[in-house]
Structure formats: C-alpha cells, structure tokens
C-alpha cells in the first residue's frame, strides 16, 4: 500500500513541474489562470467633477543659505545644511547630530545637522517660503524646524474661527520650514472655485488666502442627549419653594455637572467625527494620514458649541465691509439733521455766551459781554 501511494504523490509532484502546454489536455478543464496585478496608484482623485491633484510632499527644499533634505524610509530624519551665517531653530529634544566645527552651538564654517522625533510613525515635509504666500500651521506639534532671517512665526488665535486656528502658528517671510505629521503627508492643491472638506485632525498646514477655512458639519443620524434642567419644568413647579431649595444644594449641582461631563464626552467620542473644515480654492493643504484625537484639537466648549449648531456651514461666508462714505457725502447734511449757519457753528465752538466778571472794592460783581465798552 505504501508503494502505490508514493507513486501517486510522485506523479502529482512531477505534474506540477510540467509546463502548461504539456498538461493542457489533462488539467485544462480543472484549472483556471488568475492574474493579479497592482492597481495603478497614479489616478488622480476628483473634486467638483474635476481632477484633484493629491501628490506626495517634496523631499527637499533649498534657499540661498540653507537646504532641507528628508532622508530615510519612511522619511524618518531631516538633514539640514547651513551656511556660516544662518540660524537654525528646532524643537527642543529633536537635534540628533551636528557635523562641522561647532563651538557653543555656533560655527564659522558650514555645518550639517540631523533632526528627528521620537515617534516611529511620523514623516516629514519641507516648505520653501519665498515671501509671496504665507502658511498657517494647524497642528500644535507639526512645527519641527525652520531657518531664515526674515522668517517670522507667530501664534494666532481667531475667536471667530477657533476650530481652524486652535493652536495654530502663522508663518510669514522668506525661508525654509520643516513640518512633521503622523503617518504619511500628502499635498492637496485646489484651484479657484473648487471646494474640499477635510477633518481638522488631518490638516497639518495650509496656505493663507482671502477665503479662510470654515467649520462644516455633515448630516448624520444623531441621538439628542439633553441635560434635565428646571427651565423644562412647568412654571408652577419652578416657583415652588422645594424646587428652589433643591437647586441650591450641592447634590443637585454635582449631578448637573456629571450630566454635562457625560454629554461632552459622548459628543467628543461618538459624534466628534462630524466636525469638518471646508476649504475654498485657490489654496494648498498638507494632510496627514493619521490624525490625533479630537480632544487634542478642540476644547470642551468648542465641541458643545459646534454640536448644538445645525448641519452645514457653522459660520457663513465673510460679508464685505460696508462702503465708507465719501467726503462729499459726509459734508452733505442728512434730511433728519438740523440745518445750522456759520454763526451757530462759531457760537458752538466759542461757547453759548461770553461774559467778563469785574469785582469792585465794595465787593460787588459786574458781568459784561466780551467787547462791550463801558
């Protein structure tokens, strides 16, 4: 029994080695060729019916005094080449090494520095600012290194659009900028008239334009979770002495505080993905594939404020400022304004009336008009 079994196994193994033409008559009816190919990754996405260029960020940027190169796979280190007269600013604890003759963190000759971060799932992107376009860094930990004498970085907080500018940094001037993101970084370029909606946790930086990003909420199935309050009760119950005394107790206040915390937590963990940003072109957006948690971007007050608003744009488009009146319109009197002569205006400037007080030796006081002769 063992020999026929070995022969069968040997015959099966030799059949697998034979070319397809030799065993076509034997296994053509039993097997089928399946071809597996990689899908093309160069197909552009589409936005508003047009092709949206989503490309990888550049690996190098160069100015007259410095050069940034992203090295490693997947982009785990930043190489900075500096001239003798250039300054380099990095985040604390990110400097890996420095080549060259450096004395007290300064050098009279060109040096090359290596900059990296501790997280193993980050990638770098470099941006060259030529002074014509300013950038807004949306993430608090995205700014890694920068160089440039005229480059200025200023923290900004916009009260009208705090969701987009929470923990943001405005970058202006000329120089090189190195950004770090979680996962991979990609660049999205929008033309004039195009719109793009993206989650705020995935936005690393974007170019500043006349159309700033606005908060946007998608429509989805929601469960209304309301905190019970005294205002929801009938009027005669609110005016009762028992209800008023109970609302002043520490037990009632602690219960209401607990309900508010549960509501805020549910909005941040369950319905937090409804908060998005809408960008209007022309602009360039740098996106990261792995976004942080929503509590690292929004405060509890902002989460509750956005969650209570209806779907769609939470802030309308910027209205044009009212036209200022011209000089001719300002000089023309309005119908409701009273007409005044030149004498009336002079009298208003000088006062309603002028009197000169004269005191005699007897202690009497005489009042005379200005310019009146005795």
Curated annotation (Swiss-Prot):
Q: Where is the composition biased (Basic and acidic residues)?
A: 319-328
Q: Where is the transit peptide?
A: 1-11
What InterPro entries does this protein's entry cite? AIM24 (IPR002838), AIM24_sf (IPR036983), Trp_RNA-bd_attenuator-like_dom (IPR016031)
Q: Where found, per UniProt?
A: Mitochondrion
Sequence intervals crossing the membrane = none
Q: Which GO terms describe its biological process?
A: inner mitochondrial membrane organization
Keyword set includes Mitochondrion = yes
Q: Which GO terms describe its cellular component?
A: mitochondrial inner membrane
**Region (Disordered): which ranges?**
308-342
Annotated keywords: Mitochondrion, Transit peptide
Task: Tell me the protein family, please.
Answer: Belongs to the AIM24 family.
Protein name per the record: Altered inheritance of mitochondria protein 24, mitochondrial
> Taxonomy-wise, where does this protein's organism fall, top ranks first?
Eukaryota, Fungi, Dikarya, Ascomycota, Pezizomycotina
Q: Which gene encodes it?
A: aim24
């Amino acid at each position: 029994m063992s020999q026929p079994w070995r022969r069968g196994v040997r015959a099966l193994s030799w059949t697998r080695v034979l070319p397809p033409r030799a065993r076509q008559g034997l296994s053509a009816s039993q097997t089928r060729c399946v071809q597996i190919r990689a899908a093309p990754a160069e197909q552009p996405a589409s936005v508003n019916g047009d092709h949206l260029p989503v490309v990888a960020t550049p690996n190098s940027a160069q100015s007259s005094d410095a050069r940034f190169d992203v090295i490693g796979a997947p982009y785990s280190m930043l190489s900075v080449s500096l001239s003798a007269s250039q300054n380099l600013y990095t985040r604390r604890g990110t400097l890996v090494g420095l080549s060259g003759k450096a004395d007290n963190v300064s050098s009279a000759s060109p040096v090359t520095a290596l900059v990296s971060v501790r997280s193993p799932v980050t990638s770098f992107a470099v941006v060259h600012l030529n002074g014509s376009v300013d950038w807004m860094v949306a993430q608090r930990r995205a700014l890694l290194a920068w160089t440039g004498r005229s480059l200025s970085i200023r923290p900004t907080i916009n009260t009208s659009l705090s969701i987009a500018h929470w923990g943001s940094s405005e970058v202006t001037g000329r120089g090189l900028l190195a950004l770090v993101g979680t996962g991979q970084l990609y660049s999205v370029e929008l033309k004039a008239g195009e719109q793009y909606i993206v989650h705020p946790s995935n936005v690393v930086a974007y170019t500043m334009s006349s159309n700033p990003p606005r908060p946007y909420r998608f429509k989805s199935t929601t469960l209304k979770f309301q905190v019970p309050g005294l205002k929801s009760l009938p009027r005669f119950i609110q005016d009762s002495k028992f209800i008023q005394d109970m609302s002043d107790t520490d037990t009632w206040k602690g219960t209401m505080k607990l309900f508010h915390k549960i509501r805020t937590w549910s909005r941040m963990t369950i319905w937090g993905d409804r908060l998005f940003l809408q960008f209007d072109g022309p602009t360039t957006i740098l996106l990261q594939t792995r976004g942080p948690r929503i509590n690292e971007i929004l405060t509890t007050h902002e989460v509750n404020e956005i969650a209570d608003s209806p779907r769609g744009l939470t802030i309308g488009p910027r209205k044009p400022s009212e036209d200022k009146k011209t000089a001719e319109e300002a000089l023309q009197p309005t119908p409701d304004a009273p007409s005044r002569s030149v004498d009336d205006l002079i009298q208003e400037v000088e006062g309603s009336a002028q009197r000169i007080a004269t005191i005699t030796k007897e202690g009497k006081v005489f009042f005379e008009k200005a310019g009146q002769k005795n």
